[in-house]
Design a protein with these regions (language model features):
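Hydrophobic, small-residue-rich transmembrane alpha-helices and their short perimembrane loops
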Residues: 2-240
């Protein structure tokens, strides 16, 4: 590896670490803010319990699927041949090809788990900080002349936390794989990208189902218990 490549890898790792440190700083700043009145916290606790129950149920469902897919991904290297750079690294003879297939299969499966794990961390922590920041945004709008600016700042920090965490973990994972595999990294990075995007898709679909169920439940409560028509603005759940 040439000097310029080593320098650029070092810079990328520093950028990844800086993103993670910035995300931690944003989270710490949000959690240090007041959570509002007792009544606000009572409502917020219900939202928080619902979000955490969804995250825990999602985790129990996803982990077995990831285990099966990681094993299947190992055997994909025997269906499609490794890249040219991989063969240059391990050799183009039968022994080299067999070694390349085995090493790439291992790397692809491990990278898949790594990408899925990073995506899971982002989803879990991102959801939690979103719940934590919501009540603090509501509290910020209740006091002071600059309340809307402060509320917007809290919203920005809560959302940016997830973005910085995604960037930092993505850069860090991709760079580590590149350092280990060198010119054979594209074959292993396939698993890393697939793990991250596949888990994000699962979480996106699962979150949509969960929120739709909450929406239907809120409509039923408004109709049955309060006698309100569907999508009535007097139902707070409709506004939410």
């Amino acid at each position: 590896m040439e000097l310029i490549e080593q320098v650029m890898i070092f810079v990328v790792i520093l950028a990844a670490i800086a993103s993670l440190v910035y995300a931690w700083w944003l989270r710490k700043g949000v959690l240090a803010l007041p959570k509002g009145t007792e009544q606000m916290q009572k409502v917020w606790n219900g939202i928080r319990e619902g979000a955490l129950s969804y995250l825990n149920r999602q985790l129990k469902t996803i982990i077995p699927i990831l285990a099966v897919l990681s094993v299947l991904l190992f055997f994909t290297v025997y269906i499609t041949h490794p890249e040219r750079g991989t063969l240059e690294l391990f050799g183009n003879d039968p022994t080299g090809i067999a070694t390349a297939q085995f090493m790439v299969g291992i790397g692809r499966s491990v990278a898949f788990i790594l990408g899925a794990g990073f995506s899971l961390i982002v989803g879990q922590l991102g959801m939690r900080i979103a719940v934590e920041s919501n009540i603090r945004v509501a509290q910020a709008t209740r006091e002071g002349e600059d309340r809307y600016n402060r509320a917007l700042t809290i919203s920005y920090r809560g959302g940016t936390f997830t973005g910085m965490l995604t960037d930092g973990l993505g850069l860090l994972g991709g760079t580590v794989i590149f350092i280990i595999y060198g010119i054979a990294a594209p074959d292993a990075l396939l698993g890393f990208g697939l793990g991250g995007t596949l888990l994000a898709l699962f979480m996106r679909v699962g979150g949509g189902i969960y929120t739709k169920a909450a929406d239907v439940g809120a409509d039923l409560v408004g109709k049955v218990e309060q006698g309100l028509p569907e999508d009535d603005p007097r139902n707070a759940a409709v506004v939410a």
